[in-house]
A protein has these predicted regions:
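Long, well-structured alpha-helical subdomains associated
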Residues: 10, 21, 65, 106-153
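A short, surface-exposed helix-loop junction/capping segment
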Residues: 5-16
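Short alpha-helical catalytic segment bearing the HExxH-like zincin motif
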Residues: 68-76
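Active-site scaffold of zinc-dependent metalloenzymes
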Residues: 14-15, 19-22, 30-67, 80-83
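An active-site-proximal "capping" alpha-helix that borders the catalytic cofactor pocket
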Residues: 90-106
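Catalytic Zn2+-binding segment of zinc metalloproteases
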Residues: 62-63, 77-95
Length: 153
């Protein structure tokens, strides 16, 4: 089985945006929410995405103060509209991070990549600690991008 690799994921814009820094990242999240019909429902330190019955989409995200909180917001949007939303937990988390990387308006810093990797390591530890259960969480196959995302740091 071949090891997982990530395609080049940073989205290069054809025309550079005029906004910079946090203002650019906030505007990008607002644009995505408008585009996909997602309601920003307050603040959450860790981020949360909810798909309500009737089709209402909602995210709670931390205030965007820098890249890590921006990528958390993109990740939550990815849970609602990205590919692989209904995959098992670890794969769904990886898929949401892939959405964040593919749709970001800024190139991720090494600190952002470390943050993504650490968060996925936490989910992997969670899954490994529950392998004794009657229905254990599924650990992704070796060729899933989950494993390449773990190597970002």
């Amino acid at each position: 089985m071949e090891a997982a690799t990530l395609p080049p994921v940073f989205r290069q814009e054809k025309a550079p945006r005029t906004r910079k820094g946090v203002e650019l990242m906030e505007a990008h999240i607002e644009d995505l929410c408008r585009e996909y019909g997602i309601e920003l429902a307050g603040s959450s330190a860790r981020g949360r995405a909810i798909r309500w019955r009737g089709g209402k989409l909602e995210i709670s995200i931390p205030p965007i103060r820098g890249q890590v909180s921006y990528f958390i917001a993109l990740h939550e949007v990815g849970h609602l509209v990205g590919k692989g939303r209904s995959a098992p937990r670890l794969e769904s988390e990886a898929n949401a991070w892939l959405f964040a990387l593919e749709n970001s308006a800024v190139e991720p810093t090494s600190a952002t990549k470390r943050s993504i990797s650490r968060r996925l390591e936490g989910y992997l530890a969670w899954a490994r600690n529950r392998q004794h259960r009657r229905v254990p969480p599924r650990i992704p196959p070796r060729d899933h991008p989950f494993w390449a995302l773990l190597q970002l740091s």
